[in-house]
Amino acid sequence: DKNIYEIPNGLDKKEAPVAEPTAVSLHAVLIGEESLKKPLSECRTLVQGGGAIGLLCGLILSKIKGNKNIVLSDPNKLRLNECAKYLDAKFVHPGDVEIKSNSFDIIFDTVGLEASRQQAIDVVKPGGSIIHIGLTQAAGPFNFRKMTLQEVTVIGTYCYTNKDFEQTLKILANKDIGALDWIEFRDLKNGGDAFKQI
């Protein structure tokens, strides 16, 4: 029973399923915030990945934590264009010149590829944080030397706590991250096509 929540007033039952990825994103942002030596609002932030978790991390960072210096990267132009409709950030391809070595205070890796991890450790500033959320690849090379010598904090995050989920329901019901009009509804018979597009 402790994991069953009533949908609050202000949150449409069609929007309620977004609570799960929002709670994952909130949990990651809160853990990232705890790891920093300055407020999130003062950080230059990279969000790797423009899927649901990446977009939601960006919305929480921007609309709740006051972070106005966000770069979101994704190789899929359709995702970038969609995210740009709802999030105030700079949107780039992962290979863009905007993503330079030692230039971000905190990175949220919502992808979890070897390539995204390598980029994260390259672009994080000394003393910065990498919050690893994505689970695409289990292993691969990583610059532990930079992590050690430059005192970079690397934290893995998984799911959320009950407190995170309760807070998420309030955030969604109060529209604290904006309207959820970015949610798309498709017939189940078109599910395969939807996955191909992402």
Where are these regions (language model features)?
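Glycine-rich phosphate/adenylate-binding loop and adjacent beta-alpha elements
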Residues: D1-Y5
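Mid-domain Rossmann-like dinucleotide-binding core that forms the NAD(H)/NADP(H) cofactor-binding site
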Residues: L11-P94
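Phosphate-coordination loops involved in phosphoryl transfer and adenosine-cofactor binding
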Residues: S41-R44, F104, G127
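Redox-cofactor binding/interface segments in oxidoreductases and associated redox assembly factors
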Residues: V47, D109, H132
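Short acidic-hydrophobic, aromatic-tinged amphipathic segments that line or gate anion-handling sites
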Residues: A89-D96, F185-N190
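A short acidic, Gly/Pro-enriched loop at the edge of an enzyme's catalytic core
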Residues: E98-I107
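Glycine-rich phosphate-binding loop and adjacent beta-alpha segment
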Residues: A115-N174
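C-terminal hydrophobic helical "lid"/dimerization subdomain
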Residues: Q118, N162, E166-I198
